[in-house]
C-alpha cells in the first residue's frame, strides 16, 4: 500500500461566502443536506459517451442510478481530453482556473499557471479542501493511468493504489478494504479505470469491444456494491458515477456532441430517487456537490455549482 500522511493545510487557502446569484441558485441544496455525509464513492470510468452508456448492458450501474439522479446531458470542459476534465471534476473549476489544459501537465511544467496554489504549487482540490476542513476524513485515490494523479498534492491522500496495463479489478478490492477499515470515519474514495477509454482508442467508440469494456466494469461495480451491502455500508453511502469525455471514431478532444456530452449520476441519503435531470450540469460541479454533502464551504476560486434539483 502506498500510504501518504494526512496533514492539514492551515491557512493556505482563502474562504469566502458564495456570491448572491449563486446563493439563490443553491438555496434548496443548502437546506436539504443538514447531515454530513458518512462516505462518498466516486465510480469513475474514462471515455464513456452517452450512446455507449445507453447501449451497454449494465444492470448493476442501472440499478444503482435508479435509486438516485441521472443526467445524460452533462457537459465536459474544453478540451474534451482526460486530465483537464478529471481535474475539473475534482477541483470544482475549469482549466481557466486550475491551469490543467492538456494531458502533459505537471506541477513543474505547464503552460498556464493556476489562479491559486498551495506552497507546493497545487491548485486546491477536493482532497486538500476536505483535509483542511475535516482532518479526520480518510481519502483514497485508485487509478491505472499514470498522469491522472499529477494535479493533486499526494499528502492529502491516505491511500494511493496504482495499477499498470489497464488492470483495475484489484483496485476495486483495495477500495472495499479501505472502506471497511475506515467505516467509522468520513471517507472519500476515487475509484477510476481507463480501460474503457483505451478500448475506444484501440477499437473505435461504439465498437463491440468498447461496449464490452463498459459491461466488464459493471460486473466489478456489482461485486463492490454487493460486498458493501453485506457489510452494512451501502445504505449510508453516497455514490457518484463520473466520466470525463465521450468519443468519436478512434478519438476525442473536439467539440462534437458525442465528445462533449456525457452521463453523470449521484445516489445516496437525501438524494432524489429516480430523477433524470434536465437542468444544465458540468464536470466542474462534481466537487461542489461533494463539499455540500460533507457540509464544507467552497473555496472562492472554484466555479462549480450545485444542481438545484438533486436533493430531496
Located regions from the model:
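Active-site His/acidic residue clusters
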Residues: 145-162, 173-219, 223
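Metal-dependent active-site segment of extracytoplasmic phospho-/sulfohydrolases and closely related
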Residues: 41-42, 60, 216-257, 290
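Catalytic-site neighborhoods of secreted/periplasmic enzymes
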Residues: 98-101, 112-168
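Second-shell loop/turn segments in exported
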Residues: 47-52, 75-76, 87, 111-118, ...
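Single conserved hydrophobic/aromatic residue that forms the stacking wall/gate
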Residues: 1-16
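Substrate-binding rim/cap in mid-to-C-terminal beta-strand-loop elements of soluble/periplasmic
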Residues: 90, 255-297, 308-311
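Active-site nucleophile/metal-coordination loop of metallo-enzymes that catalyze phosphate/sulfate
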Residues: 17-37, 49-129
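Loop/turn elements at helix/coil->beta-strand transitions in domains of secreted/extracellular proteins
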Residues: 36-40, 67-71, 133-140, 183-189, ...
Amino acid at each position: 500500500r502506498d500510504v501518504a500522511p494526512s496533514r492539514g493545510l492551515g491557512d493556505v487557502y482563502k474562504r469566502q461566502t458564495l456570491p448572491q446569484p449563486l446563493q439563490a441558485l443553491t438555496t434548496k441544496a443548502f437546506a436539504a443536506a443538514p447531515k454530513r455525509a458518512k462516505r462518498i464513492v466516486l465510480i469513475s470510468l474514462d471515455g464513456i459517451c452517452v450512446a455507449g452508456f445507453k447501449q451497454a448492458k449494465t444492470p448493476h450501474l442501472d440499478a444503482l442510478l435508479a435509486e438516485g439522479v441521472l443526467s445524460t446531458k452533462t457537459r465536459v470542459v474544453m478540451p474534451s481530453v482526460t486530465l483537464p476534465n478529471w481535474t475539473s471534476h475534482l477541483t470544482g473549476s475549469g482549466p481557466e482556473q486550475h491551469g490543467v489544459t492538456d494531458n502533459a501537465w505537471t506541477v513543474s511544467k505547464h503552460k498556464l499557471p493556476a489562479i491559486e496554489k498551495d506552497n507546493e504549487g497545487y491548485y486546491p482540490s477536493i482532497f486538500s479542501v476536505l483535509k483542511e476542513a475535516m482532518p479526520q476524513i480518510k481519502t483514497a485515490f485508485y487509478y491505472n493511468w499514470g498522469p491522472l494523479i499529477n494535479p493533486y498534492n499526494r499528502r492529502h491522500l491516505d491511500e494511493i493504489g496504482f495499477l499498470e496495463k489497464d488492470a483495475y479489478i484489484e483496485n476495486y478490492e483495495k477500495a472495499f478494504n479501505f472502506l471497511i477499515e475506515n467505516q467509522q470515519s468520513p471517507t472519500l474514495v476515487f475509484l477510476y479505470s481507463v480501460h474503457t477509454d483505451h478500448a475506444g482508442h484501440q477499437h473505435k467508440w461504439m465498437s463491440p469491444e468498447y461496449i464490452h469494456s463498459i459491461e466488464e466494469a459493471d460486473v466489478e461495480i456489482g461485486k463492490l456494491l454487493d460486498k458493501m451491502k453485506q457489510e452494512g455500508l451501502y445504505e449510508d453511502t453516497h455514490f457518484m458515477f463520473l466520466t470525463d469525455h465521450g468519443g468519436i471514431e478512434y478519438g476525442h478532444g473536439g467539440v462534437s456532441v458525442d465528445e462533449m456530452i456525457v452521463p453523470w449520476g449521484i445516489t445516496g441519503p437525501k438524494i432524489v430517487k429516480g430523477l433524470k435531470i434536465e437542468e444544465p450540469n458540468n464536470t466542474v460541479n462534481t466537487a461542489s456537490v461533494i463539499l455540500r454533502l460533507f457540509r464544507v464551504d467552497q473555496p472562492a476560486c472554484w466555479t462549480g455549482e450545485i444542481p438545484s434539483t438533486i436533493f430531496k
